[in-house]
Amino acid sequence: EVVFTSGATEANAMALAGIRPGDLVAASDLEHPSIRENLTLAESRGARVNRLPRADRGIINPHDWAALCTEAPNLQVATLAGHETGAVQDMAALIDATRRRFGDAGAWHIDATQAVGKIPVDFHRLEVWTLSFSAHKFFGPKGVGALLVRRGVSLPPLFVGGGQQRGRRSGTEAVYLAVGMAKALRMAVDDMVDRQIACTQLREGFLAGIAPCKPWEILGPLAGGLNHVLLIAFSGVRSDMALMALDLEGISCSAGAACSSGSSLPSPALALIGLPEEHRKSVIRFSLGPFLNPDEVSMAGSAVAKIIARLRGPHA
């Protein structure tokens, strides 16, 4: 079943709305704020949330995940592709580890917002209960997303009214937004390989551009992750100072997720991936799109290198 929403934030809230006092939830701090904050809210209402203590380079170890709970969790929550690290989780391995530990895979919610339209995603093969995504991540219209719900799964509505969408989400559906999302998704799937190749070339050009300002470290997976996301720690540089300087050069980037850019606090994911505390305020996240000009991306990389070198000073 497809439930059309205003975006992945609402879809995530809808998927987590059924958490009850006393329920046990398995999760991690790799999640998007729209999941983390809803889990914190559930805790305040009496739910128990066990969070994974470590995920090197943003990749969850199936053994560690299965050991997270001593009893079968009522709900397990994971992000298919990390919005900060770009790490892609092996969901089949995680679900299998849970099944072997507790005899049943249990209920799962997957946030696939960064994955849908960029890598192959098959809801039925994932064997999960719910999956969320948002149209703007694959160049569709803003203000629309969806929650995929396995048939037979009951979820309480976030709000009630006219009972549209089989009572899951009341209110008149924005048909034109849904059609725009469907068209954008079809284009993204049809062009997926070409877009992946383009982003890989952009990534290589950008990394070549920033090479002169080493030391820096890519914090996500070195292979097998999303090729358009780069989370980089520039030692000896405060990210807030770098962001201001980069903005003056017309380079758009962030110290974390774009929708959390108003926060001055380092992302909880940085602790989870093992980054020392003294380096957590030196992290910058770059996102590359398949429609960017390769020459401009390479020039942006060179500009980043010059700015980082300037901020480090002559004795760096």
Regions found by a protein language model. Give the residues of each.
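Pyridoxal 5′-phosphate
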Residues: 1-316
